[in-house]
Amino acid sequence: MEGSGDKRHENLDEDGYNWHAQSVESVSKALGTNPNLGVSDGRSAELLKQHGYNELKGQAGVNPWKILLRQVSNGLTAVLVVAMVVSFAVKDYAEAGVLVIVIAFNTIVGFVQEYRAEKTMDALRKMASPSAKVIRDGSHHRISSRDVVPGDLLTFEVGDVVPADCRLIEVLNLEVDEALLTGEAVPSLKTVQPIGGKDVSIGDRTNMSYSSTTVVKGRGKAIVVSTGMSTEIGKISKAINETKTQSTPMQRKLNLMAYMLLAFALLLALIVFAVNKFNFSTEVVIYAIALSIAIIPEGLIAVITIVQALGVRRMAKQHALVRKLVALESLQAVTNICSDKTGTLTEGKMVVTNVWLPGHESEYIVAGQGYETVGDLSTSAGVAVVRSAALEDVNYRLLVECCALCNTANIVEASEGKVWGDPTEIALQVFAYKMEMGMPILRKHKELVEEFPFSSDTKRMSMVCQTESGNFLEIFTKGSEVVLSICDNVMDRTGDIHSISGDEGFLKLVSTQQEEMAKQGLRVLVLAYGQVSERSIGKPLSKWERNDAEKSLTFLGLVGIRDTPRVESEQSVRNCHRAGITVHMLTGDHKATAMSIAKEVGIIEEPHGSEIANGNEIVPLSASVMTATEFDQLTDEQVDALVDLPLVIARCTPSTKVRMIDALHRRKKFVAMTGDGVNDAPSLKKADVGIAMGAGSDVAKTSSDIVLTDNNFATIVQAIGEGRRIFSNIKKFVLHLLSTNVGQVIVLLIGLAFKDRTGTSVFPLSPVQILFLNLVTGTPPAMALGIEPASSSVMQVPPHVKGLFTVELIMDIFIFGTFIGILALASWVLVIYPFGNSDLATLCNTTANLQECSTIFRARSTVQLSFTWMILFHAYNCRHLRASLLTAEGGGASRFFSNKVLVASVFIGALLPIPTIYIGTLNTEVFKQEGITWEWIIVIVSVFVFFLLSEFYKLLKRRFIKTPYNM
């Protein structure tokens, strides 16, 4: 029989074989295996050669060289490298040395930050089970999971991690936690019968078990159908590796700007040579270098890197770990969040929330979050119920006892997460603890003497208890609606028993209540109770069968269980809406559960209609809630024709999540995806911002841009607010630095007209002065702008999706730069002509000839000081680009000293140029300037005029620009 599957083996993976739809016999035949003996050792060796090891490919560790390459392969760094090479070529070692330091600093900071973030485990490899229990040639073996092959016969028990995708052939109360794949908090109860249909979601393929899922209950035997990259985990891994990382708008704009600056720098150098009739003397070459350097913002990369690094530290304190610096920019542009439900919007823990008892006017509502063993009772109308009073009701007390005793969960410290067992049973036990009737208390008076475990056939579980008196046995039963079929009676509050045999009205009442609770997204359990004696059964307890205990029971009530929303989720969603961000929930849960949670956290209110055109047919759809099957059946054209994309997609698959993100991208939306499971990994990488939960899988973390260490959806809102703050501050210091460059270019371009006796242009600013202004004077205030606190309206305006260089920012750069350049040039002209000797002398670009160059050197000092004080004042201008500096909003008045780093950088920056002007040799030999006296008046007047021009320009902006201010 082994040989019969050889040919079929070659194409099983590629054909997308529907293993869940096949009988055990068909699967065995297709794989050439014996469902009792497994494959032989020889056959397994052949299959290993054919299919390869059961491991995931393409998951190499951190590569420092690739990280380093990313740091130096951006446009701005390329510009700095070109400038450095030219400086070395003309033997201007001071300037070249400064540029080397700047490039090295930028590279080191970026490398260290990204290397730390990327230094994570090889998550996908380590998710695989380290060993597997396999049957080969009829013998049991424990082998490495990487040696498992298609056709192998595996056995599972509680605690095992499934090593490969398998078709189940035997199960005994087998439940598997598939939350990492499906997102469902409730373990999947496994079966062996074939499941028809091609489009059955993973969560509904109950006769399959998948690689990296965990057995939480029972035992099973299965045939391996897929290994390695052919497993569902492997497909996800492949999707992750194939997803290309796109650069952000700011990256693209900065790179474009850098190459434009490089081209412009070469053009300016050409202009210098042309104006000087292509005289390549040292004086002219140095002027060309000065003009080329003037247009390059040497400090920009350093400031961006440092500000982002500070932002990373700040976000880490807020429980958001940034793995990729580009996420800081991406966050501010987010327009849509696609969120997983389990563990993200919800606690990821099953909790009893509703209890319905016959004869009561309303349900009991049970408060409390997660596994906390405290929680108040109230009616559905919100009226508080005293616990002790509720327990006086015999019916309710027995229902609580049933929750505690018909249970195998173990709770040590629920508040610390020390719980073991099936999530549903944990929820029931925690509920009993809330009523101060947990199993440890009840076991003091009642002994568990027999268990009839849950099975897929009976869909119920029963426990038999011996009371202290020993006169009778108590039977506690829980399960699905089938429990009602073995109930002959119902109990009232006083404990009296009433028959319900043939009472169709009562059965309909219970059925209606079950449906209502299910519509709320609850998993509904039926609880029942009975009293018997061994004598009445007619045989000793040790020989009892299930039917001996589970008959003629008394119906106690219904318990509703669900994965409750986090306390902060509703407010977080509301904050997102206020910030212009739409929240979508993509979950593996059923539609009713998904809709209930979405309503509770505020994602949707009531489903509203939408339509799509499909030829001549109008197909009605819900614009709020759809299943993955409904969504996937639509073509891309039909999806794009929807007025609104669904806010909730239930029974969601990994491919559906990616398709949803693609649909949002086609609508020019900027998407963040949150999640914690393996099933979220492809979409986390596909999204513009992938946000993983710290308690989630390593796969999700590896695929993400940001990891939330507190698993708190509210942290996402804080992270987006922080991203907006950082991006706003980047715009502020980009304006500050680039307007300085524009001013310098204006001074040096017009300065070409000032020629000495030999006809050589004399620069108003020397290359060292320019570097001093750009790095020493301009960079500290720019960094201070980078740590400006967020404005109060940062999360009350729509996302900024236009990128860094908006029309307004470009206009501001050139207008403020023109103000600075013209006023600085005016200082140059005033010192030389009206108040100087009007003589530009000779060789004042290269020598320190004080006898002839004194006026030129004094004029340069005046220009440098005017530049210095104007760009320092301009830092305050940049705090708010529309409000007057005289107002608190604009950074003046009460806010003038709020940014202490800015105050210090401005004060120190104003004093730093003074030594370069008055210290001998340093001033004349290095900076090509000298001390001034009366020229200080020109400096002060220049700054005052710049203030007036800035205020007038802002006044015009406030009057004529009506778009929202989001900086």
Swiss-Prot record:
Protein's UniProt keywords contain Transmembrane: yes
Cytoplasmic side: 1-70, 114-254, 305-732, 834-900, 953-967
Extracellular side, ranges: 92, 276-283, 754-812, 922-931
Record-linked InterPro entries: ATPase_P-typ_cation-transptr_C, ATPase_P-typ_cation-transptr_N, ATPase_P-typ_cyto_dom_N, ATPase_P-typ_P_site, ATPase_P-typ_TM_dom_sf, ATPase_P-typ_transduc_dom_A_sf, HAD-like_sf, HAD_sf
GO molecular function, one term: P-type calcium transporter activity
Membrane topology: Multi-pass membrane protein
GO biological process, one term: sodium ion homeostasis
Catalytic activity: Na(+)(in) + ATP + H2O = Na(+)(out) + ADP + phosphate + H(+); K(+)(in) + ATP + H2O = K(+)(out) + ADP + phosphate + H(+)
Binding site for ATP: 342, 425, 478, 523, 587-589, 651, 657, 679
Top-level enzyme category: translocase
Chief location: membrane
Effect of disrupting the coding gene: Increases accumulation of intracellular sodium in conditions of high sodium ions. Does not affect intracellular potassium levels in presence of high potassium. Leads to sodium ion sensitivity, the sensitivity to potassium ions is not affected.
Active site, renumbered: 340
Membrane-spanning ranges: 71-91, 93-113, 255-275, 284-304, 733-753, 813-833, 901-921, 932-952
EC number(s) stated in the UniProt entry for this protein: 7.2.2.3
Glycosylation sites noted in the Swiss-Prot or TrEMBL record: 279
Named cofactor requirement(s): Mg(2+)
Induction pattern: Induced in presence of sodium ions and high pH, a combination of these conditions has a synergistic effect. It is unclear if potassium ions positively influence the expression level.
Protein function: Catalyzes the hydrolysis of ATP coupled with the export of sodium and potassium from the cell. May pump potassium inefficiently. May transport other cations such as lithium. Sodium/potassium efflux ATPases are involved in salt tolerance and maintaining the membrane potential across the plasma membrane in high salinity (Na+) or alkaline (K+) environments.
Family: Belongs to the cation transport ATPase (P-type) (TC 3.A.3) family. Type IID subfamily.
Name of this protein: Sodium/potassium exporting P-type ATPase 1
Organism: Physcomitrium patens
Upper taxonomic lineage: Eukaryota, Viridiplantae, Streptophyta, Embryophyta, Bryophyta
